[in-house]
A protein has these predicted regions:
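Extracytoplasmic metal-acquisition and chelation regions
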Residues: 1-208
């Protein structure tokens, strides 16, 4: 069964070495997931590492790099706190994706459980009858108000799961993994922080 609950919880952010291992696909006996940027805690680690590298390359401007990194990390930390507060006050602690699941690091950060049709790096797009049935029953069992998807135009699987539930009235909501971000999106004002803020709004609704 490809649908599953959260296999483990990560209490602390990954180190730079851990993040590089994930990005390079090194196998530690766990399912690999390169979507490390979807953890705000990991993002703080990455910003620090980038700032340190820039200061070594350009020591004349090290104070500027340090100040910029500090200001950005403060914003990341504030948003991280907003996520934690939202989860702490939520009625539910489980999300269900009728799609691939690239948000493992995010749910691990806040102690959430999850069910998903496919792993985050899966190339699959067609779920079996058993998977659809399993996920629909979980929606009913847990009283979930939403079935989540990732960005993209094809949400047919999530819609099929909803049609297979008893109530057939759950919303299909989208969280953005930023895998499809374009230069046009950036020109229109999309940033890492703005996307993660939108994801927080969706998560709040899914956990309500």
């Amino acid at each position: 069964m490809s649908a599953k609950t959260n296999p483990f919880f990560v209490k602390d952010a990954l180190s730079v070495e851990d993040i590089l291992d994930e990005l390079m696909g090194h196998d530690h006996g766990e399912e690999k997931d390169e979507h490390v940027w979807l953890s705000l805690k990991n993002a703080e680690t990455l910003v620090t590492a980038i700032a340190d590298a820039l200061q070594e390359l350009d020591p004349d401007n090290k104070d500027t790099y340090a100040a910029n990194a500090s200001a950005y990390i403060e914003k990341l930390s504030a948003l991280d706190g907003a996520y934690q507060s939202a989860v702490d006050g939520a009625a539910r602690k489980t999300v269900l994706f009728g799609d691939r699941f690239p948000f493992r690091y995010l749910v691990d950060d806040y102690g959430l459980s999850y069910y998903a049709a496919f792993a985050g790096c899966s190339a699959e797009s067609e779920a079996s009858f058993e998977t659809v049935s399993f996920l629909a029953k979980k929606v009913d069992e847990l009283g979930l108000p939403c079935v989540l998807t990732i960005e993209g135009k094809n949400h047919k699987l999530a819609e099929t799961i909803v049609r297979s539930t008893a109530g057939k009235n759950q919303k299909v909501l989208t969280m953005d993994s930023m895998q499809s971000m374009t230069s046009k999106d950036a020109a229109n004002g999309a940033t890492y922080l703005s996307v993660m803020e939108r994801n927080l709004s969706v998560l709040k609704e899914a956990l309500d």
